[in-house]
Structures are given as C-alpha cells and as structure tokens.
C-alpha cells in the first residue's frame, strides 16, 4: 500500500486509545481519537467546498482535491502547530492505511461499473477517438518528461519517469466525465455517448499502462524483476478469470430478485477483494489492482451487484475516500513551485496536456466526420482528470519517480484541466433542444381515431400496477398502435456509483433509457414489456437520470420531442396501510409543480390508492367505475375528454356529475373583461357537454347527471356519496372555491386536494388533470423547428 514519506527520525508508534482528559492525557496523542478528528475535519471541509462549487457545476472530486491541498502544507499546513497537532507525522501511517483501504473498495466499485461486454461493442468511431486520445497525449507526455528530467527531476530513473508522465497526461477520468456530462445534460446526446464510450476504452488502457509503469519502477537491480512482476500480474488476471469469476457468478446465481442477499456471500466477496489486493501487493504491482480486477470479473447482472454496491459505496465514498484526497494533499506542497522556471514548467505541462488530448481527439473526430464544434467539445471532455490521475501521481511519488515539485505541478495540472472542462463546454457547446411542432397536445381532439401518445412517469415499482392498469383502461379499442406509451423512470442523479453505471449504459436512441445491467431481472422492465406483448399498446421504457432540481426539463423535453398529448406524474405521497397519506419527499413535490408550469401538453397527477389492487389486471377482468365531477373550465373539459377515452374500454363505467351551483359557491370573476371571459367559458362548457351527449362512444357505459349545490358542504357531501368508485378524474383548476383548509398541495387544485386528503374516506385513486393552454406563458424548453428531423416518428419502430 501507498504510505507517506517521512523524513528525519522515525516517530514512535501511537497507542490506540487514551484514558481521558481527566487523567491528563490528550486524545490527540492517541491513534483512534486523532483519526476520528481527521475524518470529521476532512469530510466537513470537503463537503463545504463541494457545496460552494455546486453552482459552478463542478464535480465533487474538484472540491476533494482542493480540500486536500488546502489542508496540507500548501495552506493550513504552513502552520507548524496545526500540522503537529492535527496531522502529526506519527499519525500519517494510520491515515494512509485507512485511506488506501477505502480506495481499495472504491476501485472494486469502479471495476463493477466497467462492463467489458459493452466495451467490446464500442463502435469504430469511438474506438478510433479513444486510441488517438491516448496515443498523442502519451507521446507528448514522453517529450515533456525529457524537459522535466533535465530541470526539476534530475537523477530519477528515466524509463519509469517517461511512462508515468505519459500515463498522467493521457488519462481520462471515466466517473468524473460521467458526472460532468450528467450535470450538463449531454449524456444521451451523440457527443455524450461518444465521450463515454471512448472514456471506457481509455480507462482500461490507462490501467494497463499504469501496471507497466509500476513494474518498471521497482527497486530491483535486475531488469528481470520487472519481467517477473508483469508475468505474475498476468497470471493473477488469468486466475481471477478462471477461479474468482466462477465463484462470484455462483453466489450471484443464488441471489434471486426480490430476496435478500446472504450475509455470507457479501462477507466472502469482501474477503476475496482484500485477498486479491494482498496478492497483487505481494507481486509488486500494487494492492489496488487486485481489487479492481475482482470488480471487473464480478457479475454485472442481477441483484448481487446492486446489493454489493449499496453496502459498500456510502461508507467508502462518503467517509473513507476523502481521506485519500487529504493524504494526497499532505504530500502536495504548492510552495515548491517557485521561480519563473517552475511556473513556466507548470504552464508547459498544462498546455502540452491540453494540446495532446484535444488535438488528438479533434483530429480523429474530424476523420470520423464529426462536426468541428462537437469535435472540440469532445476534446475538452476527454481532457477530464480525476481520482485515477491522483492514484498514478501518488504511486509515482511513493516510488520516488516523482519528486515534490513534479508531483505538485502534475496535481495542479489535473485540477486545472478538470476545473475548466465544465465552463468551456458550456461556452462552446449549447445543444439546441429542437423538436418538430405538433398539434395533438391535449386529449381533446376532433379525430378520435388519431394516435394518442402518453408519457407515463414513475419513481419506483410501487407506482407500476396502478399506472399499467390506468393505461389499460385508457387504451380503448381498435387498431394496434392507437395508444403509445413512453414509460419514464424518474431517477435522481446522485454521487452513487450505481447511478454512474446507469449513465454508462445509456444507449443510442436520443433519450435516456433503461440500464441494461438490470434489464433481465428488473421488475419494472418486466412489467412494461409483458404488458406490451399482451396488449395492442406500444410501450417504450425510458429513464431520466438527473438532479431533482432539473429533472422536469428532461420530462418536458422528452414530452415535446415524442409529441405526447399527456404527461402522467405520480403524486408525491402514497397511501399507508392505515389509509393516511405519507410523503416520499418534498423535492418530488417540487418536480410535479415545475412540470405543470413548463409542460408542452396536458398533465395528469395520479394519486395512487391502488387502482385494480397491487397487481396488473388482465383486460378481461378490468371493471372500474370512474367518476368525473364537472364544475367547468379548461381543465375539467380535458378531464372529461380523458374520461371519454376511457369509456371506450368495455370494462369501464363512467359517470359524469355536472355541478350546478348557486351564486357564491363557484368562483366569481371580476367585472369588465372577466365577466366576458366567464360567459365564454360557460358557453364552451355547455357546448362541450352537448357534444359529449351526442358522442357515439357514449354507450350504455356512460351516465350523466346534474347536481344542484348551494354551499361548500353540499359539494363535499355530494363527492362523498361518490366515494365507492375506483377512480376520480378531476380538473386541476375547477371553477370552485377551496374545499379544504390545507394549502400544501396546490398542484391538485381545490377538488383534488379534498379527494386526496386523509379526511376523505375512499379507496379510489384520483387523477388530477391540467389541460394544455396555448395562451399560457409556459416558457417552452424546446425550440420548435418545422424542418426538424424527428428520428423516432413512430413509436412502433422503436419497439419492434
């Protein structure tokens, strides 16, 4: 394992625990309380930096690198009292050991993310870009190494120094690049897919080159030592494929979906990771390679991989990994870069790094007929550095290939090149969100036989049964393809590696879709695919991976580009066993509100109380009673239009109750132009109801009644008399005063708030509908272009 170089007299070992301050013993003189203080300081400091850098859309690794440098001798460490108290030399062995243990398991997770099956399928274009993006920077790095070795790195072994410099300048940080692309919403664009594919190839090549560099940097006097190290390393990889891979696959097969993974299997896997690290450290390659190789050969399918990730990553990424950045920062002394020569060398290293990576990537991209602006953007994206860069540099310093000055220069180079990536890409590449204009933005339409497209969003498997049963109830009858559904899984983009793995698996259909890792076993995919095969409905599963503060942009953009008539959203509360509504998070509440403001079509919010029970209902068993309280207005008309679509299904019984209220019960408008507006609204409502009564779809399954009410209590009593139905479909902005005191869910409107409240005793689900109003200022997220080439004109083409 890597350890911090200590000069001078070797400090004595520290005892683990103290007897306490009351016995005149300082806790900072003992290993356990001191490492606890160091962990708390590092985590709090780096998290605060990450918070302040978040508006700049910088990945967290930037904050962790800067935090490590500031905690080291470059800033706070300039105070000898601070270093001797918080990071004394005698504590650095414990700090380094704990940091490297965290790094071991983190690289195991990185190996889990890399799927060689996907890398094998990398297109020739991405492969060429990756090769050029590695080769030219490596060559430039070799040239730069001669300049450094002639100035600030005199006396080092030339061959290892050349290889380390080449690797350091040619690396692309795969996880960091994924984070940047996600923040910029470029993951599912052509440039994002090319960048991720090329970065995957680059990552594998970087580890192979690093293994070579470590082998060459050994202390052995005979050149045969390096050969033996490489041969033994190759033998270990073969052993991992032949022995470790089948063992892990055996345990994965014995972990079926929906059942907990045995603790024994998790324990065995973690032990294998540590044992492999011990073997590779004994060989002389480095302990990190053992963990990384085990991660690569581990099975990627099924719940076993997911459970391992969930059990490891929070502790490792949140607590232990920042210690590695702190340990690296303690070795980074920026003050060693002084004088015109040193600063000139820093500029030289930065320029040569950017030149090699950008020119190599741009040149190969142009050969692949990538437009120049996209090629330059790709070049800057591929110039991203990260944790792997720090690992290379720390190994080089520990093996005395890099001295303090060269190490500091290369750390600052990695920090600078990563920091500039986001602002430069935002400056030079602003992909226009274009879409073809379309007319069917509502359920209301004259041509009832035209194709109806719905974007159905959900958070988890909890939303699936009711969502599928609602779709089944809405498909009507007739020719195949009349109803087309895009089922979008809303997934919050987090720092978790499982989210990054999904990012890596985004395929090339122009929109985010399912992660293939879970495709064979994921219950959500199985449910929608089974429904598609059984019904005359085309279903396209998708996944929106984004921060919850901006995921509404993905929803609205996808809705426009797929030309849907309605977006279905799950309510942010679900019903508990006792009937009370429980929130799944306020941020999902805000997502729904933002979609209502920016949607390019109608929107429905589904309050799920178990439509059809907790499982999917077959078509022959659909028997739902649907009730629509009609007060008037655009949203009520859209709700009624949706009900008329549902009544086409032979298992649906629809009852429409038109409320006729005395003066003062309904919303009253101001005089002047608002009186005229109210009059027009009433005329439109009456005309719409007349058309409803004459609609040929309104057979014996449709009933219409008028209810006269004189007060709010009358309305509530009438609604309660309808509570034995299966589904309420209501307009959001119904022309009625508030029916409940609570104002915490304005997105449901006055009627929806009452029907979804815990005080309203019913088992019926509620669909709250907001009709698309072309006159409203929705600040569209998509620029309409009549000449826009819609790549997916028919959903049936995508699901064939």
From Swiss-Prot:
Q: Does the keyword Transmembrane apply?
A: yes
The subcellular location is: Membrane
Any one cellular-component term (Gene Ontology): late endosome
Q: Which domain of life is it from?
A: Eukaryota
Respond yes or no to whether keyword Ion transport is given for this record: yes
Where is the stretch described as Disordered? 776-800
Question: Could you give a GO molecular-function term held by this entry?
Answer: antiporter activity
Cite the Pfam families for this sequence: CHX17_2nd, CHX17_C, Na_H_Exchanger
Per the record, membrane topology reads:
Multi-pass membrane protein
Please list every transmembrane segment annotated in the UniProt record, as residue ranges: 30-50, 60-77, 92-112, 127-147, 158-178, 196-216, 224-244, 278-298, 315-335, 343-363, 375-395, 408-428
Q: Give the Basic and acidic residues compositional bias ranges.
A: 790-800
Q: Which UniProt keywords apply?
A: Antiport, Ion transport, Membrane, Potassium, Potassium transport, Transmembrane, Transmembrane helix, Transport
Let me know which tissues express this protein, per UniProt. Expressed in the whole plant but preferentially in pollen.
Q: Name one GO biological process term.
A: potassium ion transport
Q: Where is the signal peptide?
A: none
What InterPro entries does this protein map onto?
Cation/H_exchanger_TM, CPA2_transporter, Na+/solute_symporter_sf
Q: What does this protein do?
A: May operate as a cation/H(+) antiporter.
The UniProt similarity line reads: Belongs to the monovalent cation:proton antiporter 2 (CPA2) transporter (TC 2.A.37) family. CHX (TC 2.A.37.4) subfamily.
* Name of the protein described by the UniProt record: Cation/H(+) antiporter 19
Q: Which organism is it from?
A: Arabidopsis thaliana (Mouse-ear cress)
Its ancestry begins with: Eukaryota, Viridiplantae, Streptophyta, Embryophyta, Tracheophyta
């Amino acid at each position: 394992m890597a350890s911090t170089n200590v000069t001078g007299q070797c400090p004595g070992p520290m005892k683990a625990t103290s007897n306490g301050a009351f016995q005149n013993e300082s806790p900072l003189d003992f290993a356990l309380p001191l490492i606890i203080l160091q962990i708390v300081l590092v985590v709090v400091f780096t998290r605060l930096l990450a918070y302040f850098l978040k508006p700049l859309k910088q990945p967290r690794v930037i904050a962790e690198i800067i935090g490590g440098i500031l905690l080291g001798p470059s800033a706070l460490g300039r105070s000898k009292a601070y270093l001797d108290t918080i990071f004394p030399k005698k504590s650095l062995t414990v700090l380094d050991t704990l940091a490297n243990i965290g790094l071991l398991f983190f690289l195991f997770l990185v190996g889990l993310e890399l799927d060689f099956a996907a890398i094998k399928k990398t297109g020739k274009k991405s492969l060429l870009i990756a090769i050029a993006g590695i080769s030219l920077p490596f060559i430039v790095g070799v040239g730069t190494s001669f300049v450094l070795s002639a100035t600030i790195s005199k006396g080092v072994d030339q061959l290892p120094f050349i290889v380390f410099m080449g690797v350091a300048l040619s690396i692309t940080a795969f996880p960091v690049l994924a984070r940047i692309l996600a923040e910029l919403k470029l993951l599912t664009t052509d440039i994002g897919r090319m960048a991720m594919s090329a970065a995957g190839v680059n990552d594998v090549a970087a580890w192979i080159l690093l293994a070579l560099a470590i082998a060459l940097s050994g202390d052995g006097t005979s050149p045969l030592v390096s050969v033996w190290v490489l041969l033994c390393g190759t033998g270990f990889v073969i052993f991992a494929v032949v022995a470790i891979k089948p063992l892990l696959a055996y345990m994965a097969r014995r972990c079926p979906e929906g059942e907990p993974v045995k603790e024994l299997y998790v324990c065995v896997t973690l032990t294998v990771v540590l044992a492999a690290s011990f073997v590779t450290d004994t060989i002389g390659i480095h302990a990190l390679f053992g963990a990384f190789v085990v991660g690569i050969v581990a099975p990627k399918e099924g719940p076993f991989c997911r459970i391992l990730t969930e059990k490891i990553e929070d502790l490792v990424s949140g607590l232990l990994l920042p210690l590695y950045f702190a340990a690296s920062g303690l070795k980074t002394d920026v003050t060693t870069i002084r004088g015109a020569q040193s600063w000139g060398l820093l500029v030289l290293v930065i320029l040569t790094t950017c030149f090699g990576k950008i020119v190599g990537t741009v040149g190969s991209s142009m050969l692949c007929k990538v437009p120049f602006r996209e090629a330059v953007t790709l070049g800057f994206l591929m110039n991203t550095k990260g944790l792997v860069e720090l690992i290379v540099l720390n190994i080089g310093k520990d093996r005395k290939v890099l001295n303090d000055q060269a190490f500091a220069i290369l750390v600052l180079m990695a920090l600078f090149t990563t920091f500039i990536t986001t602002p430069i890409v935002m400056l030079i590449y602003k992909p226009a969100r274009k879409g073809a204009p379309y007319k069917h933005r509502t359920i209301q339409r004259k041509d009832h036989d035209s194709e109806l497209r719905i974007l159905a969003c959900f958070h988890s498997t909890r939303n699936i049964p009711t969502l599928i049963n609602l779709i089944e109830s809405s498909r009507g009858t007739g020719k195949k393809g009349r109803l087309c559904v895009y089922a979008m899984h809303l997934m919050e983009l987090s720092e978790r590696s499982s989210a990054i793995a999904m990012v890596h698996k985004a395929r090339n259909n122009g929109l985010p879709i399912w992660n293939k890792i879970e495709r064979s076993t994921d219950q959500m995919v199985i449910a929608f695919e089974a429904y598609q095969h059984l019904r005359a409905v085309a279903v396209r599963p998708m996944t929106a991976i984004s921060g919850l503060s901006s995921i509404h942009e993905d929803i609205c953009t996808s809705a426009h580009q797929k030309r849907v008539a309605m977006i279905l959203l799950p309510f942010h509360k679900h019903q508990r066993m006792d009937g009370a509504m429980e929130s799944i998070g306020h941020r999902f509440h805000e997502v729904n509100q933002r979609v209502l403001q920016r949607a390019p079509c109608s929107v429905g919010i589904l309050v799920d109380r178990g439509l059809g029970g907790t499982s999917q209902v077959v078509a022959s068993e659909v028997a739902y009673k649907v009730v629509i309280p009609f007060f008037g207005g655009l949203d009520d008309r859209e709700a009624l239009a949706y009900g008329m679509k549902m009544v086409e299904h032979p298992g649906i019984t629809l009852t429409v109750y038109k409320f006729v209220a005395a003066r003062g019960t309904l919303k009253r408008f101001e005089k002047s132009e608002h009186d005229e507006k109210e009059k027009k609204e009433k005329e439109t409502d009456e005309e719409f109801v007349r058309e409803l009564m004459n609609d040929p779809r309104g057979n014996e399954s449709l009933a219409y009644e008028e209810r006269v009410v004189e007060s709010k209590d009358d309305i509530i009593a009438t609604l309660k008399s309808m509570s034995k139905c299966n589904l309420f479909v209501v307009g959001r902005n119904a022309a009625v005063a508030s029916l409940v005191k609570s104002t915490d869910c304005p997105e449901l409107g006055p009627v929806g708030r009452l029907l979804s409240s815990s005080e309203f005793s019913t088992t019926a689900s509620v669909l709250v509908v907001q009709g698309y109003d072309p006159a409203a200022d929705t600040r569209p997220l998509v620029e309409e272009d009549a000449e826009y080439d819609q790549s997916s004109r028919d959903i049936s083409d995508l699901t064939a």
